[in-house]
From Swiss-Prot:
This is NADH-ubiquinone oxidoreductase chain 1. Disulfide bonds: none annotated. One of its GO terms (molecular function) is NADH dehydrogenase (ubiquinone) activity. It is a multi-pass membrane protein. Core subunit of respiratory chain NADH dehydrogenase (Complex I) which is composed of 45 different subunits.
Length: 318
């Protein structure tokens, strides 16, 4: 039964990821006054499957100077971690109901750094190594703010369990009392998923695709799938943390539809930002985090810690 439930989570997530690639190309196409994919199938709907067929039927290449075991393990690890992150997510009922669901997501997402580092180092290419080093520094840095923002949210909901966040937001979204945190969280998720304007790790103009330059065929497709799964996952998590819908046990499908619509809107915002903004310089990216986001998130976290103590000391009014 668990395997059936696992497949019912993984397969729709993979289908969503496939159509996200098509949505991105369509959105970017229309924003640049062109059509985007429209040949394969009606309105280009079969384009993701054609891309997958092309990539997985190409000959897998292994560079002669590469460290083969790490080189082959890295793409599989990237996709596995992206899929593993879905297990504690309530949609409305999670696959596995952890008491420490948010901590699990934070710890597992930080493991994705290893796949990027291994791929950059094992490829034995200077471009790949520079891309990997940038990715590691960027991801680890932005995880600091993500963790502090999550801590602030936990202080408001009172539990590490993701289901309790839905209960907390029955009457009002957490977006309203903590909108500065939500804005910083969204910007940090852009950097965490290596998306524009924070896609320094695979800057085509200077690093020729970055850490995955030596990858081709199926292994490249696995990295690509892992990246897009992370985008959907991060937006689903943002929806759960800041925009959760009220859950009615009699009609669970209304929660799922609401959840999917919000995640889709946030994902479209990711694509819109990619079309609209140029890439940051690396020092600007780090300056934004360490000089701006970190002091702000720490100050807000201290505010949320001190507020209950402050209000409990006020005597009752007659």
């Amino acid at each position: 039964m668990f395997m059936a439930n696992l497949l019912l989570v993984i397969l729709p997530a993979l289908v969503a990821m496939a159509f996200l690639t098509l949505t991105e190309r369509k959105v970017l196409g229309y924003m640049q006054f062109r059509k985007g994919p429209n040949i394969v199938g009606p309105y280009g709907m079969l384009q993701p499957f054609a891309d997958a067929m092309k990539l997985f039927t190409k000959e897998p290449l292994l560079p002669t100077t590469s460290t083969s075991m790490l080189y082959l393990t890295a793409p599989a690890l990237a996709l596995s971690i992206a899929l593993l992150l879905w297990t504690p997510l309530p949609m409305p009922x999670p696959l596995m109901n952890f008491n420490l669901g948010l901590l699990f997501i934070l710890a597992t997402s930080s493991l994705a750094v290893y796949s990027i580092l291994w791929s950059g180092w094992a490829s034995n290419s200077n471009y790949a190594l520079i891309g990997a080093l940038r990715a590691v520094a960027q991801t680890i840095s932005y995880e600091v703010t993500l963790a502090i923002i999550l801590l602030s949210v936990l202080l408001m909901s009172g539990s590490f369990n993701l289901q309790s966040l839905i209960t907390t937001q029955e009457h009002s979204w957490l977006l309203f009392p903590s909108w500065p945190l939500a804005m910083m969280w969204f910007t940090s998720t852009l950097a965490e998923t290596n998306r524009a304007p924070x896609d320094l790790t695979e800057g085509e103009s200077e690093l020729v695709s970055g850490f995955n330059i030596e990858y081709a065929x199926g292994s490249f497709a696995l990295f690509f799938m892992g990246e897009y799964m992370n985008i959907i996952m991060m937006n689903a998590l943002t929806t759960t943390i800041f925009l959760a819908a009220s859950y009615n046990m009699m009609t669970p499908e209304t929660y799922s539809i609401n959840f999917m619509a919000k995640a889709l809107l946030l994902t479209t915002l990711f694509l819109w930002i990619r079309a609209a903004y140029p890439r940051f310089r690396y020092d600007q990216l780090m300056h934004l985090l360490w000089k701006n986001f970190l002091p702000l998130t720490l100050a807000l976290c201290m505010w949320y810690i001190s507020m209950p103590t402050l209000t409990s000391s006020i005597p009752p009014q007659m």
